Swiss-Prot record:
Monomer. One of its GO terms (biological process) is glutamyl-tRNA aminoacylation. PANTHER family: GLUTAMATE--TRNA LIGASE (PTHR43311), GLUTAMATE--TRNA LIGASE, MITOCHONDRIAL-RELATED (PTHR43311:SF2). This is Glutamate--tRNA ligase.
Length: 464
């Protein structure tokens, strides 16, 4: 019987959900759901000083907003798999550490941070390109070892075999192999008693029966270390896949310090982007469907997801493309959903026409709210210039002769066009500016109608 596919997203509660983390979570979610498997949310919260209050809830809430709902989490645990927060598993990690020490597969390393720095320095001077820990470097007396041991002034390192290749067939990149001599014995428990990332994540993945690990390429260097830990315990390792980085449009890796680009899901949520659009957009950051389709629903993406189509090249975060996605979804959003979000005091008929008109070009709810202000707080003074007042006079003359409806406003525009033989910008701009006091906007007849007859006539009378 085939094992159930189980993937996981395991962030640290150190801040808001970043675009990169959201993309990783999404691919893990799609991978699991495509195979009728389970997607697990787990928390790596042992770095107490960096943890942010509310960080866990923020991560889960933003994932839920996107439509990424885990099958298991700290809030929805499966008792079979134990705790879902690393901070609640310290005794378990310690027991596994003790087991490795007992078997001679790990040992106490008594180096102080200053002594390690000196070893680093000596290797650099000797031309060693990348630091390898040398367990024979530190020379201590028996009494000093005893003192440091009693004071718990030590870390625990995994003892690696010499000249051993750790290899895996990466889901994204194909075969990768790293030799143990290029790694060196590495720390699996820090001197503060907390396990390192590489150790805790192996224990967690093993205990939770994780079958596939999809994560960013920055973890490639961690994988051979994790394989060494799996081997030390005699456990089967999951299948690994390392996603390419996300860059800005200049090809530079996204930096959280770059304020020119919104990089946190919370920002898009607050501005009123369609979550389905962000879900769709993120799925195409490093993956393409076999039929090249771009607009795909949640269920379509699950059905079509194929890890073989994950990109081997970096993905550019194109904000213009994301805006386009959001506009496509905004057009399809039911008017009543938008009306509920914009808190308009106008009547139902007006609200429906307003939303139907303005959602055609809007990427966010915030944009629609801004446009609503044009009608709720209309400008009292025209601050724009027009080139041809004859167009305005002619338009108003035709408009006054009819009932004030969208169809008749459009008819007055068309009659002005025919009477004066003007078209395009020369026709529309004078009318738009004088009737709406705006230079840009949606379909002109509807934009004018939404202001109401009294205000439009008051504005145009000045030109008659």
């Amino acid at each position: 019987m085939n094992k159930t596919i189980r993937t996981r997203y395991a962030p640290s509660p150190t801040g808001y959900l970043h675009i990169g983390g959201a993309r990783t979570a999404l691919f893990c979610y799609l991978f699991a759901k495509h195979s009728n498997g389970d997607f697990i949310f787990r928390l790596e919260d042992t770095d107490v000083e960096r943890n942010v209050e509310g960080g866990e809830a923020s991560q889960l809430n933003n994932l839920a907003w996107l439509g990424i709902v885990p099958d298991e989490s700290p809030l929805k645990p499966n008792p079979k798999y134990g705790k879902y927060r690393q901070s609640e598993k310290l005794a378990i990690y310690q027991a596994y550490i003790d087991e490795l020490i007992k078997q001679g597969l790990a040992y106490k390393a008594y180096d102080s941070s200053e002594e390690l720095a000196k070893q680093h320095e000596e290797q650099e001077k000797a031309g060693v390109a990348s630091f390898r820990y040398d367990p024979t470097w530190l020379k201590l007396s028996e009494s000093e070892i005893k003192r440091r041991d009693e004071a718990k002034e030590y870390s625990i390192r995994l003892k690696l075999p010499k000249n051993k290749n750790y290899s895996w067939d990466d889901l994204v990149r194909g075969p990768i192999s790293v030799n143990s001599d290029d790694i060196g014995d590495f720390v699996i428990m820090k001197s503060d008693g907390y396990p390192t990332y590489n150790f805790a994540v192996v224990v967690d993945d093993h205990q939770m029966d994780i079958t596939h690990v999809l994560r960013g390429e920055e973890h490639i260097t961690n994988t051979p270390k994790q394989l060494a830990i799996y081997e030390a315990f005699g456990w089967d390792n999951p299948v690994f896949g390392h996603l390419t980085i996300i860059t800005n449009m200049e090809g530079k890796k996204l930096s959280k310090r770059d304020k020119s680009l919104k990089q946190f899901i919370e920002d898009y949520k607050n501005e009123g982007y369609c979550p389905e659009a962000i879900f769709n957009f993120l799925a195409l950051l490093g993956w393409t469907s076999g039929d090249k389709t771009e607009i795909m629903s949640h269920d379509e993406l699950i059905k079509k997801f194929d890890y073989n189509r994950l990109s081997k090249s970096p993905s550019k975060f194109d904000i213009v493309k994301m805006e386009w996605f959001s506009k496509q979804y905004m057009k399809k959003l039911p008017n009543e959903v938008i009306i509920e979000k914009i808190n308009s005091p106008k009547d139902a008929q007006w609200n429906n026409l307003f939303v139907e008109t303005y959602k055609q070009q809007a990427a966010t709810i915030s944009e629609i709210k801004e446009n609503l202000k044009i009608y709720l707080f209309p400008k009292e003074k025209l601050e724009l210039q027009i080139d041809n007042d004859l167009v305005v006079k002619t338009f108003f003359a035709h408009l006054k002769a009819k009932d004030f409806t969208i169809e008749n406003i459009q008819a007055a525009i068309d009659e002005t066009k025919n009477a004066l033989n003007v078209k395009g910008k020369d026709l529309f701009m004078p009318i738009r500016i004088t009737a709406t006091y705006e230079e840009h906007g949606p379909e002109l007849a509807k934009a004018i109608y939404l202001f109401g007859k009294d205000l439009v006539y008051k504005r145009l009378t000045k030109w008659s």
